[in-house]
C-alpha cells in the first residue's frame, strides 16, 4: 500500500489552516461575548476534556491508524480492525460518560468548582460520546490513506460549531451554549465520516467478531500503553491551566488561555506531520526499511523546525500589535506569557514527528519513559512557579516542560534505532531567524498602526526568511525540487 506523505501532510495542515482562518475572526467575538471570567471557565472545561479524553478514547485514534494501515495478507483485515476498535471505543466511552454525569448529579462538581459547572459536566458527558464516534470515523479514513476525505470534515465541523456557539453565548447561555455547539458539530461530523466509510468498509463489521487468530492481545497491548502515553502528553498540555485556574483565578486563566491559543498556531505543520507519520512509518517499520525511516525523520524534523522558527519569530515580534487588536485591550496581559511560551512550543514542535515515528514502530515503553521525564519537570515547575508568579510562572514552567520534550525524545529515538537530527542544520536555521528578526523588529516598531503592521510585516518577513534560509543552506535547491515533485498537482496548479 503506497502512500504520499506530502499529500497527507498537506491535507491535514491545509484543513487546520482553514479551521484557524475560520476561527481567526470568530474567537475574539466568542471571547468578548463570554468575558475573561467565563472564558477562563471554558478553558478549564477544555482542559478537563483533554485529560478525560485520554481514558475515554482508550488509544483508539492511534491504534486504528497504526493497524488498519498495515499491509496484511488477510483481505478482511481492515474490516476486522474497524469492527474491533469500534467496539472498544463504545466500551470506553459509555461508562466514562456515565461517571462524568454522576459526578455532576451527586454534587461533587458543584462543591469543588461551583454550581455553574454542574451543567457543564452534564454536557461534557454527551460531548465525549460525540467525539468518540467522530474519532473512530476520522481515524479509519486516515489509516486508509484518505486524509483528503477525513480532514474536510474538520472544516465542516467548525462551520456548524461557530454559529451555534456564538449564537447561544450571545443569547445568555454562556459556556453551556459553547459546549452545545461542540456536541452538535461533533455528532454531525461523525455521521458524515461513517457515510464516507461505508464506501470502503462494511459497517456491519461492528456487529461481527473477528476470527480467533486475530491478534487481539497485540492491539490491546498497544492501546493500553497508548493510554499511558496519551495521559502523559495531555498532562503536559493541560497541567498549567488545571493548576492556574484554582490558584490564580478565572481571569488569569482566561488571559493565559488566550496566550496558549496564539502560541499553538505554531503547531499546524508539526501536528499534521505527527498525524501522518504514525501510520506512514508503521508501514516502513513493518517492512524493516530503517535507513529510509532515518532519512525521512531527519528531513521532516528539519522542515518542521524551519517552519516553526519562522512562525515563532513573527508571533514574538507582532505580539504587541496582534493580541490587543485580536482579543481586545483587556488582553494585553496575555502578551508576556505568549512570548515566554514560544521557545518551548518550538521545541515541542520539533519533537512531535520524532514521537510519531516511535509510535509507528510500537516502541511505546521507551516513549513513555521519555515523556514522563518532561511531564515530571513540567508539573514540578508549575507547582513551584504558579503560586509565586501566576500566569507568567505558568508560562515559564510550561515552556521549559515543552522544550524538554525535544531533549528526551531525541534520546529515545536513538535508543529505538533512528537519528532524527542528522540533517537539522540548526545553526543555519537560527541564522535565518536572526536575520529576519533584525529586519522586521524595527519595521514593526516604525509602523504606528497595528493593523497596518500586521498587513505589511508578515509578507516581508516571509521573503526575508526564505531568502536567507536558501542563502545560508538551511533550505537548498534539492529540497525545493523534491517538494515540488511530491506536491499534488492540484496544489501546484493553484500557485502556477
Residue ranges and their predicted role:
Residues 3-61, 93, 97, 121-127, ...:
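Signature of the first transmembrane helix
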Residues 10, 15, 19, 42, ...:
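Transmembrane helix-bundle signature of multi-pass secondary active exporters and lipid flippases
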Residues 56-73, 143, 263-308, 355-359:
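Helix-loop junctions and terminal segments of transmembrane helices
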Residues 106-124, 315-349:
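Interfacial segments at transmembrane-helix termini and the short loops linking adjacent helices
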Residues 122, 153-202, 260, 373-378, ...:
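Hydrophobic alpha-helical transmembrane segments
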Residues 129-154, 176, 342-374:
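Membrane-interface junctions at transmembrane-helix termini in multi-pass inner-membrane proteins
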Residues 172-175, 179-182, 193-237, 280, ...:
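Interhelical loop/hinge segments that connect adjacent transmembrane helices in multipass membrane
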Residues 441-496:
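Membrane-proximal transmembrane or re-entrant/amphipathic helices at the cytosolic face
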